[in-house]
Amino acid sequence: MIREERLLKVLRAPHVSEKASAAMEKNNTIVLKVAKDATKAEIKAAVQKLFEVEVEDVNTLLVKGKSKRHGQRVGRRSDWKKAYVTLKEGQNLDFIGGAE
């Protein structure tokens, strides 16, 4: 069993975009920013425990940080991990319910 403090550190924030909204409506999938070292099993356990929903599948990917210029200097944004969490049929999780 994964410790509760680790579960709280795994999930960072919901990722809100057009693609994420379409995935939620079409496939019942939520998109989350997660800790870079998080595993699929940890992400699944964290979502099930914190949001009390049943998870069917978890897909993850690493998003590479973009290079950004600040005048003459070139900086780089940090890499981060994105998780597509598919909920079981009949389950619902609404992050942006009243934001119309």
UniProtKB/Swiss-Prot annotation:
The keyword RNA-binding applies. The lineage of its organism: Bacteria, Pseudomonadati, Pseudomonadota, Gammaproteobacteria, Enterobacterales. Belongs to the universal ribosomal protein uL23 family. Part of the 50S ribosomal subunit. Contacts protein L29, and trigger factor when it is bound to the ribosome. It comes from the Bacteria. The gene is rplW. It comes from Yersinia enterocolitica. GO terms for cellular component: ribonucleoprotein complex; ribosome. One of the early assembly proteins it binds 23S rRNA. One of the proteins that surrounds the polypeptide exit tunnel on the outside of the ribosome. Forms the main docking site for trigger factor binding to the ribosome. PROSITE patterns: RIBOSOMAL_L23. One of its GO terms (biological process) is translation. Keywords: Ribonucleoprotein, Ribosomal protein, RNA-binding, rRNA-binding. One of its GO terms (molecular function) is structural constituent of ribosome. Gene3D superfamilies: 3.30.70.330. PANTHER family: 60S RIBOSOMAL PROTEIN L23A (PTHR11620). This is Large ribosomal subunit protein uL23.
